[in-house]
From Swiss-Prot:
Cytoplasm recorded as keyword: yes
Compartments, as annotated in UniProt: Cytoplasm
Family that this chain belongs to: Belongs to the MurCDEF family. MurD2 subfamily.
Signal sequence coordinates: none
Record flagged with keyword Metal-binding: no
Record's catalysed reaction(s): UDP-N-acetyl-alpha-D-muramoyl-L-alanine + L-glutamate + ATP = UDP-N-acetyl-alpha-D-muramoyl-L-alanyl-L-glutamate + ADP + phosphate + H(+)
Stated name of the protein: UDP-N-acetylmuramoyl-L-alanine--L-glutamate ligase
Organism taxonomic ancestry: Bacteria, Bacillati, Actinomycetota, Actinomycetes, Micromonosporales
Length: 452
């Protein structure tokens, strides 16, 4: 369904945040017979609904809001409306067409778009793709799940988008290049279960992309894709890391060396995988990555990564403090821990308890010497899950500040103190940025507290 298909139809936009506002303005320009906005959220009218918005669509809520949704031919929901919302279940049961602004936008721009999703790595990989394309004279607009609704993006010849599972769920068109970086259980409460989450995530691939690029090292992706044609980055026949001309690890395309691994400033094998995916996408777009290897190496060297993703904080003690607050699942925390293999690590875990299974984390740490500090709410359950592992020291502390203080006492001077919570921030913190701020402040405030 395209925006132009809404001409002459009754349309309800569900959500009054940035996505809903962008949808109202875009849809109003295409002449719907009737347009209304509905908001059932707790922060109803947190932003004023006035001017062109109010002229284009009245805003309603409560029971009247549901009645207006049910009376519409098409409902355009914001990504924040979960699949499990009882209103959404009822609307679909009544046969109401439900879509999103991202789906309407994609229908008109799919052939010019690289779409990147993944349970982890989508932000870094999409940023890398956009950054590297610019370095080889391929201008692009970067957007998606980074605060700017797709319907607000300027016109461009090429788009690179980071797409959440919520944004992927209602797509009826796949982008020209569809990319998946990783697949593991996440956001199960919003999607209704693990299978439903995978279905919504992989809907990005379901509508005829020209090329699919995936992380070939991800076992769940491999199982879900089966024998479907795809570029499996990390495999020997495509972009991968292997010994180079000087015997050190290099990035390669097939048997052709590109540049040393040391050029990439990001730590961790998972970030090697992210760059392999990004380079494979450039090749799929027709970039001669071998001929442009020098320019790409310079661009890679200048890529400093994104905030709150293995962001190191300077400390006079010799300890390396690392903010990885966006690691909200056990699998993400496992990647972060692996990034500092060979060094003593104290990892701080815990946050909002969504009932995730932490058994994979226990299995991952079974042979590793590591200190684990659990903070509320899920930290106590994580520590209990790790009980009995012979090389794991695990204890519960009162809060994040206490965890930083305790980490200074337990971690050797050349060690790493890693905030990789394996859980979301809500409940104890306003958002993930607030959790990051509290961590950084605790690091500063305890700087006079000697390491072990």
């Amino acid at each position: 369904m395209r925006l132009s298909d809404l001409r002459g139809r009754t349309v309800a936009v569900w959500g009054a945040g940035r996505e809903g506002r962008a949808a109202v303005i875009a849809i109003a320009a295409h002449g719907p017979a009737d347009l209304v906005a509905v908001d059932d959220s707790a922060n109803f009218l947190a932003l004023p609904w006035e001017g062109p918005l109010a002229e284009a669509a009245p805003l309603v809520t409560g029971e009247e809001g549901f009645a207006r949704l049910a009376a519409a031919e098409v409902v355009v929901r914001s990504p924040g409306v979960p699949n499990t919302h009882p209103w959404l279940v009822e609307l679909r049961g009544r046969g109401v067409t439900v879509t999103q602004g991202s789906a309407l936008w994609m229908a008109d721009h799919a052939r010019r778009t690289v779409g990147v999703t993944g349970s982890k790595g989508k932000s870094t990989t999409s940023s890398l793709i956009s950054h590297l394309l610019t370095a080889v004279d391929r201008p692009n607009v970067f957007g998606g799940n980074i605060g700017v609704p797709l319907l607000d993006l300027p016109d461009a010849d090429l788009y690179v988008l980071e797409l959440s599972s919520y944004q992927c769920a209602d797509l009826t068109d796949s982008p020209r290049v569809a990319v998946v970086t990783a697949l593991f259980p996440e956001h199960l409460d919003a999607h209704g279960g693990e299978r439903e989450y995978y279905r919504d995530k992989l809907n990005l691939l379901a509508h005829g992309p020209q090329t699919i690029v995936v992380n070939g090292a991800d076992p769940r992706l491999a199982a879900e894709l089966g024998d479907r044609p795809a570029v499996r980055a990390g495999s020997p026949d495509t972009t991968h890391v292997a010994p180079g001309p000087d015997g050190t690890p290099w990035f390669h395309l097939g048997d052709r060396p590109l540049f040393p691994r040391a050029v990439l400033p990001l730590v961790g094998r998972h970030n090697e995988g992210n760059l392999c995916v990004a380079l494979a996408v450039l090749a799929a777009l027709g970039v001669d990555v071998v001929a442009r290897a020098d320019a790409l190496a310079v661009a890679v060297a200048g890529f400093q990564g994104l905030a709150h993703r293995l962001t190191e904080i300077a400390d006079p003690s010799g300890l390396t403090f690392v903010d990885d607050t966006l690691a909200t699942s056990p699998y993400a925390a496992m990647h972060a821990i692996d990034a500092y293999e060979g060094r003593p690590v104290t990892v701080i875990v815990g946050g909002a308890d969504r009932g995730l299974d932490y058994a994979p984390l226990r299995e991952h740490l079974a042979e590793r010497e590591i200190t684990v500090l659990g903070i509320p709410d899920s930290g106590q359950r994580i520590v209990a899950t790790l009980a009995g592992l012979p090389r794991v020291r695990a204890e519960v502390v009162d809060d994040l500040v206490a965890a930083v203080r305790r980490a200074r006492e337990l971690t050797p001077a050349d060690g790493v103190v890693l905030l990789s919570p394996a859980a979301p921030s809500y409940g104890r913190f306003r958002n993930f940025e607030h959790r990051s701020e509290v961590f950084a402040e605790a690091v500063r405030d305890t700087a006079g507290h000697p390491a072990r």
